Every structure is written in C-alpha cells, then in structure tokens.
Amino acid sequence: MRRPMVAGNWKMHGTRASVAELIEGLVKQALPGSVDIAVMPASLFTSRVIEGLQGTSIIVGAQDAAIQAEQGALTGEIASSQLADAGCKLVLVGHSERRQLIGEQDEVLNKKFAAIQASGLTPVLCIGETLEERKAGQTLEVVGRQLDSVIAEFGIGALVNAVIAYEPVWAIGTGLTASPQEAQEVHAAIRAQLAKENAEVAQGVRLLYGGSVKAANAVELFSMPDIDGGLIGGASLNADEFGAICRAAGN
C-alpha cells in the first residue's frame, strides 16, 4: 500500500519573521504518523527550517536544484549535493512555474532529475497541462509526453525512487481546482502509462495532486484511489490549514 505524502511548496515567500512564525505553527500541529510530510522553503531559509522542525516528523526539501550534482562554477545555482549536505530529503523538478516562466525544457529537467537522484535525494517530478491544452483536449497527451521524457532517458526503474506530482497549470494559485473525478482520471491515466512499462513500479509510485488543494477539498481529493496526497502551494503558508490537509491525507 502506498504511503500518503503531503508536501508544502512555499515558493518565493517568507521573511525571517514570517518563517519563524510558520515554523512555530507547524510544531504545534497534531500531524498523522501515517503520512510523509514535507515542506520546501526558499533555499536561504533551509537551515533555519530544518533546525526549527527538529523533533517533528516533517522533512525539508528544496524547490529546485542545479543541472549537476556536485559543486562547481555555476553562479547562482545550488547543487543537489549541497542540498543533501544541508539536510534536504527531496527536490521539486519541472514545476510548471519553472517550465512556463523560466523556460526550462525537458533536456534541462532530465539533467536535474539525474543530479537529484545522484545525490541520494528524491525528485518530485511535476507534470501538468495549461488551460489552453485542457480546452483542446490535450491533457493526457501533454502529461504523457512530459512523463515519457524521463522514462525514455532513464528507464522506468528511475521512478522507483521518485514521486510524481500532477499539477494542472490552470489550477495553480487561481482558486480553481480539478474536481476529484477529473483529477482521478488523469492520475489513473498516469498510472496506466507507467503500468505499460512495469506494473509493479506503477503500483508503487506515489502520485500527488497539486492544484489549489485546501482543507475544504482535501478529504474528497485524497479519497480517490490514485491520488496519494498533495503538493500544496498557498495553503502550506498557513500552519493550521496545512495541518488540516495533512490530517485529511491520514484519514
């Protein structure tokens, strides 16, 4: 049985004061022991968050990593080996904001995926379609292509030590969300695509939903058979809301 996961992506938010307040709120939460829980702060707060969450079950990840695992001459970048040394456990790769706004292509994302795994960290591979692609009926084609890029490069076995997050781009930060049935349809298609390569891997890979998940809709979303938790954006910046989402995943 797949263990649920809830991961909070803090994105480019936080000051020293607000991060300290958020840590304090998270420490007070009654969190389920049956759920893997992670937060991904902006990198300059990584050490502060890891230290503040010591003694809790919450692990800390990163929102991005460089195209190479080791340190080197890449100004402004952070190597996955440095993230591992700092205490991170997982790293986002391919988030829609980096695909859409930064222009990261599959070739770059594959290098990051490999570097993250080479450093002993877990990549959280984000895939999803835009509103235009959904309206054109291209959802499954788009997410399938994004997933195929990794499988073609590394083989299905690379996903044994990875998490996949389906995030419909049109539902991120907009307040819109796919219905539980719509989200389940895509998650089921993703798992079916994986099963064509290896049924055992397909059944073991955790598929998170990442489109405006809130405490109010988490229970229904997480009740779907192929939704194994959530990649949480704005709601993860509120400790009480995030705690409620985590508890929903544990039900």
Curated annotation (Swiss-Prot):
Catalytic activity field: D-glyceraldehyde 3-phosphate = dihydroxyacetone phosphate
GO cellular component: cytosol
Domain of life: Bacteria
Pathway(s) per entry: Carbohydrate biosynthesis; gluconeogenesis; Carbohydrate degradation; glycolysis; D-glyceraldehyde 3-phosphate from glycerone phosphate: step 1/1
Catalytic residues identified in the record: 95 (electrophile), 167 (proton acceptor)
Disulfide bridge map: none
Binding-site residues for substrate, renumbered to this chain: 9-11, 173, 212, 233-234
Quaternary structure and interacting proteins, as annotated: Homodimer.
Protein's job: Involved in the gluconeogenesis. Catalyzes stereospecifically the conversion of dihydroxyacetone phosphate (DHAP) to D-glyceraldehyde-3-phosphate (G3P).
Protein name in UniProt: Triosephosphate isomerase
Gene: tpiA
